[in-house]
Amino acid sequence: LFGFLIPLLPHIIGAIPQVIGAIR
């Protein structure tokens, strides 16, 4: 399971600023 999630971490982390920007 983690072998599938780890490659996605950069995408998830990269999307965080966009989510924050959308909330503001």
Swiss-Prot record:
Tissue: Expressed by the skin glands.
Keywords tagged on the record: Antibiotic, Antimicrobial, Cytolysis, Hemolysis, Secreted, Toxin
Lineage: Eukaryota, Metazoa, Chordata, Craniata, Vertebrata
Secreted recorded as keyword: yes
Subunit structure: Exists as aggregates of 3-4 molecules.
Predominant subcellular localization, coarse grouping: secreted
Stated name of the protein: Grammistin Gs G
Family named by the database record: Belongs to the grammistin family. Group 1 subfamily.
One GO CC term, this protein: extracellular region
A molecular function (GO) term: toxin activity
Function: Thanks to its abundant amphiphilic alpha-helices, it may integrate into membrane phospholipids, leading to lysis of the membrane. Its high hemolytic activity is inhibited by phospholipids, but not by cholesterol. Has antibacterial activity with a broad spectrum against various species of bacteria including both Gram-positive and Gram-negative groups. Also has high ichthyotoxic activity.
Subcellular location per the Swiss-Prot or TrEMBL entry: Secreted
GO biological process: defense response to bacterium; killing of cells of another organism
